[in-house]
Amino acid sequence: MATVAVGERAPGLALRGLDGQTYRLHEATGPVLAVFFKVSCETCRLAFPYFERLFQAYPQGGWHLWGISQDSSSDSQAFVEEHGVTFPILLDADWAISQAYDPEGVPTSFLIGPGAEVTRVVPAFQKAALNELSATIAGYVGAEPAVIIPDNDPAPPFRPG
């Protein structure tokens, strides 16, 4: 298998979240940013506060940010609490969805546009890519683009997963 690429149709996605709801890609209104992660991943720990900033930057309803955890419910809940994550965390403990998307590493983000087409794939942690994702989402929701990571932020410009 190979990582789902830009321009390809996103594999179906139906996972239960930590909140008990089931999230289905085909029922989502607007684009979905799906971020695959593991709680033990140091790069994920670096990235998730910025994903939270992205989530808070735009009104909800016109787009979705879903973290897809490859860990247990209890470990995922501890991660959420430690990092102050408020967006939905979906559980893929058996890795069925992860295998379908086949990210090369974690974190990997897939921006899935209307019609379920993958419009962007961002592996690892990349400052510039997060700001570009922000601008793309702003276009989808009709908002001014928010800078998620300013130039003077101390995070490294890139960190592999």
Model-predicted segments: where are they?
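Non-globular targeting/processing and membrane-anchoring segments
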Residues: M1-V32, H64, E81-E82, D102-G105, ...
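Structural microenvironment flanking redox-active thiols in thiol-disulfide oxidoreductases
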Residues: R45-H83
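Short, glycine-anchored, charge-dense loop/turn motifs used at functional sites
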Residues: G20, F110-T119, P123
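Short active-site neighborhood of thiol/selenol oxidoreductases, capturing the structured segment around
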Residues: R24-R45, F51
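Short beta->alpha linker loops
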Residues: D71, D92-A93, A128
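Cofactor-binding loop segments of dinucleotide-utilizing enzymes, especially the Rossmann-like FAD-
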Residues: K38, Q70, P114
